[in-house]
């Protein structure tokens, strides 16, 4: 793992969290219980404080940063998709930020809300509970349905289960030279296939 102290502040990581060895945590970063931090994520607490609350996930290639005297927060069971950028914002409890979305300074995403992939949430945006946000700039298009929230929660549970699976079996290795016969497939713990 790449952990760096900065001006006397050392990242805090709960022992039940999983932080991928290629992720980087710098300075004023607080990671809660059961959190998943994916490969190549960068949590740079060299200006403001970064808080990832219990059960949340920060996926591959995400960036968290913020200005001085600000907190960038991902609430409990928050779900931050691959490549998303969070800068000085607050992501509410049980909310999802889609892949490659950008959430700017002072923005607040309401709890149980979903930000669609590749959306841009402007600085100072104030969301409400259970909104579906999309676009550039993002706007609320409707409420999140019960089915969508259920799907989001199943996906978040997959990442919560992945924490234990990674602690139990993830390790560095050398590649095989060819695919073995009858190669098994990995199985998730729940069916999260999107319904069409």
Curated annotation (Swiss-Prot):
Overproduction of CaiE stimulates the activity of CaiB and CaiD. GO terms for biological process: carnitine metabolic process. One of its GO terms (molecular function) is transferase activity. This is Carnitine operon protein CaiE. Belongs to the transferase hexapeptide repeat family. It comes from Escherichia coli O7:K1 (strain IAI39 / ExPEC). The lineage of its organism: Bacteria, Pseudomonadati, Pseudomonadota, Gammaproteobacteria, Enterobacterales. SUPFAM superfamilies: Trimeric LpxA-like enzymes. Residues 173-196 are annotated as: Disordered.
């Amino acid at each position: 793992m790449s952990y760096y102290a900065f001006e006397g502040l050392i990242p805090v990581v709960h022992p039940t969290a999983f932080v991928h060895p290629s992720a980087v945590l710098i300075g004023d970063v607080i990671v809660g219980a059961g959190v998943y931090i994916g490969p190549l994520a960068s949590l740079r607490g060299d200006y403001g404080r970064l808080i990832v609350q219990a059960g949340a996930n920060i996926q591959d290639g995400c960036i968290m940063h913020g200005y001085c005297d600000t907190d960038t927060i991902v609430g409990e069971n928050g779900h931050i998709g691959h490549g998303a950028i969070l800068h000085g914002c607050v992501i509410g409890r049980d909310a999802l930020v889609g892949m490659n979305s950008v959430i700017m300074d002072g923005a607040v995403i309401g709890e149980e809300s979903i930000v669609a992939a590749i959306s841009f949430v402007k600085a100072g945006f104030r969301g409400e509970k259970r909104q579906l946000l999309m676009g550039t700039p993002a706007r609320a298009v409707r409420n999140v349905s019960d089915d969508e929230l259920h799907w989001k929660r199943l996906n978040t549970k997959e990442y919560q289960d992945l924490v234990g699976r990674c602690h139990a079996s993830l390790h560095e290795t050398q590649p095989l030279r060819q695919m073995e016969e009858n190669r098994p497939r990995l199985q998730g713990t729940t069916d999260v296939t999107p319904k069409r």
